[in-house]
Amino acid sequence: DGPLIIFVHGWPELAISWRHQLPCFGSLGFRVIAPDLRGYGGSTVYDRHEDYALENVVADMIGLLEALGANKAIWVGHDWGSPVVWSIASHHPDRCHGVANLCVPYYTLDRGLDACVGLINRDIYPKDEYPLGQWEYQGFYEENFAAAIAPFDANPFNAIKALFRGGDPASKGKPSRTAYVRRDGGWFRGAAEPPDVPRDDKVISEIDLFAYADALSRNGFFGPSSFYMNHETNATYADRAVNSGVLEIPVLFIAAEYDFTCECIDSRLTEPMREHCTDLTSKVVQSGHWMAQEKPAEVNAALAQWLATSLPDVWPK
């Protein structure tokens, strides 16, 4: 019965992505919930790209909130879960005590791919070589969706091992591997299926690996990857945000120092967020993209400190 925190996962994850956060904040007295988003795990799989537009996913989350008998929640997102949470905050601020997001800053992917392109670090991604910068892979989804998802569907087990890797400081200042997807004609240098690489036990256990792979084998990658197919629709939806998109609720953003796709340290990617949040707290965790799983103690500490200082009235009594 404590204050409600809803954790929203990203691509290609599940509710178990928050397995290190749920017991932590539950033990502090919060009521903690982590759903599988539409297309994932035990949730409904829809068969049209447009079914995965942010407006529809936000409606799911508001429906979940109401089904839980709550008027407001603290919302926490990661990866595609971040645009979902940002959209809840910008369209339904009355449903938010506050919001926290990992890796993907506000006023970027929640407003479509074009909102990100103008913020690319062209020192790393010259425009003539990487027109979409680190977001080249998203352009490939739009141009050849079937080819984009084929290797993942061919071997979800290997896909999870290849994707869920810890941060690599040596890659700083170099193009992200996502920048080569369009040039290579697909993920994994255009291979028919992902390489068989060792599991990175700093990020996922063997049990986690099988849970992810089993769910993605059942449902396939059509639904999860359809999140990349609604940029124009999402931009139109974002234009209808209340208060001109300015967030006046408490906001926490946690950047991953070694996430070189959502690169927030040496780029302009966070500038629009800073201009559109009146109560923003920013933190940096030394991790790769999967920070809630790679560095759970640091993520939990950042979340707990923000909750205690920015939302003291919501802290469990």
Labelled PLM ranges:
Residues 11, 15-18, 80, 86, ...:
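Signature tryptophan residues that serve as conserved aromatic anchors
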Residues 4, 40-72, 76, 80-280:
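Flexible "cap/lid" subdomain of the alpha/beta-hydrolase fold that forms the substrate-access gate
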Residues 10, 53, 79, 294-295:
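Active-site helix-initiating loop/hinge in glycosyltransferases
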